[in-house]
Amino acid sequence: MTTGVQTLKNYIGGQWVESRSAKTEAVPNPATGEVLAYVPISTREDLDRAVAAAKEAFKTWSKTPVPRRARILFKYQQLLVEHWEELARLVTLENGKSYNEAYGEIQRGIECVEFAAGAPTLMMGRQLPSIATGIESGMYRYPIGVVGGITPFNFPMMVPCWMFPLAIACGNTFVLKPSERTPMLANRLAELFKEAGLPDGVLNIVHGAHDVVNGLLEHPDVKAISFVGSQPVGEYVYKTAAAHGKRVQALTGAKNHSIVMPDADLKVAVREIINAAFGSAGERCMAASVVVAVGDIADELVERLVAAANEIKIGNGLEESVFLGPVIREAHKQRTVNYIELGEKEGAILVRDGRKDAAVQGEGYFIGPTIFDRVTTDMTIWKDEIFAPVLSIVRVSTLDEAIEVANKSPFANGACIYTRDGGNVRKFRDEIDAGMLGVNLGVPAPMAFFPFSGWKNSFYGDLHANGMDGVEFYTRKKMLTARW
């Protein structure tokens, strides 16, 4: 182990404690390969200790007055704002995305804390003073208990902040299993929450992999699981946790289609598609994966997309004006290369080859923006979630065909349309099978105050993340009917 590189600790019961396991994994900077830290691959015993701490803390936290919980969240929001630049830099270091994108991610996370700080309003019930003569009835919200969260590498700030601030604001306690690929930001979030006055045991962090995940899914004292990650794992999480009697929300894979109509403003469409396809190295559930070009606009659209992709600066996300950083690991880079080779083999036309960019030949896990034209729905690159800076272009003649292509995918996280025609927008809105829709913009981004998630194989569960769906997920209701 490299001298001077720290091994991260778990956060259990308000204390930083070493894992019972001696096994660790390196956390490299994806842009350089430099090891930033080592993360413990914790055991079921570590997880059990965290759940026990959360269960004990729930006894008092669930009874803490809601306004006091809100004041702690307000203080937490202030601390996050004060440390905004530090947090953004940490995201770039361990994830690789550009500093500008990381800065925006911190904003999204802070917005989630701001929403959660409205707990006194969010936790309000309802009353009807007279359901019959002399009888009144009311609904009251209560926390559900210990909640488990399992988060991915691609948004180490935003996704955890979808989960634990709102769960905690509602009176629950929380055990977070962050991605072992980006664990450092999670620890910093816990430090700042403690500084804000959060009592010990309300938030716990256990680093690790399969043992910790399975422990959360199976532990009888964990009442709910929130998950964001790949489709196969999300389906497993949903089925396993549900089989153990837990409430589950699992946000999973995507293959988002962007439909470009003949009347579209091409300047806007190209700008938005480039940002959506290649921002965060394509490693996001709302990335534009497929462009469906309608009618005779296709040739010019492809030409403009390639020209714009050629202007993208690739490199270390901490460098000024860098737009496209590395993918998360060398193995993911090779997986992307394999998909590019497969796309060529299956007959798609490679109009921009990201393997040839200069940055790909140096240190770090870089792959340049890659664009395929004349992709068809029987090709693997159309079917699979590649999760990398690879864009496929499908050509069709009508909006009906474009909608048919998009709806054919088993994924249904999001879709966008570029048009100036309100009739096109209405048809798109009503007929597309997806949860997050955009018009003349590339990423219909999650907002703290509205529900966020997809349909079909992009989501398992009933209640989505964020907004009042999130409040519903983290609370249960009691009805009181009284005669006086």
Curated annotation (Swiss-Prot):
**Any one GO biological process:** valine catabolic process
Give the molecular function GO annotations.
malonate-semialdehyde dehydrogenase (acetylating) activity; methylmalonate-semialdehyde dehydrogenase (acylating, NAD) activity
Which residues take part in binding NAD(+)?
Answer: 153, 177, 180-181, 230, 252, 385
Pfam families from the xrefs? Aldedh (PF00171)
Which EC number(s) does the record attach to this protein?
Answer: 1.2.1.27
Q: Which reaction does it catalyse?
A: 3-oxopropanoate + NAD(+) + CoA + H2O = hydrogencarbonate + acetyl-CoA + NADH + H(+); 2-methyl-3-oxopropanoate + NAD(+) + CoA + H2O = propanoyl-CoA + hydrogencarbonate + NADH + H(+)
Task: Locate the active site.
Answer: 285 (nucleophile)
Q: Which UniProt keywords apply?
A: NAD, Oxidoreductase
- UniProt-listed InterPro entries: Ald_DH/histidinol_DH, Ald_DH_C, Ald_DH_CS_CYS, Ald_DH_N, Aldehyde_DH_dom, MeMal-semiAld_DH, MSDH_GmP_bac
Pathway of this protein? Polyol metabolism; myo-inositol degradation into acetyl-CoA; acetyl-CoA from myo-inositol: step 7/7
**Superkingdom per UniProt:** Bacteria
Q: Quote the SUPFAM superfamilies the UniProt record gives.
A: ALDH-like
Q: How does it assemble?
A: Homotetramer.
Summarize the protein's role: Catalyzes the oxidation of malonate semialdehyde (MSA) and methylmalonate semialdehyde (MMSA) into acetyl-CoA and propanoyl-CoA, respectively. Is involved in a myo-inositol catabolic pathway. Bicarbonate, and not CO2, is the end-product of the enzymatic reaction.
According to its UniProt record, which protein family does this protein belong to?
A: Belongs to the aldehyde dehydrogenase family. IolA subfamily.
Q: What is this protein called?
A: Malonate-semialdehyde dehydrogenase 1
- Organism of origin is Geobacillus thermodenitrificans (strain NG80-2)
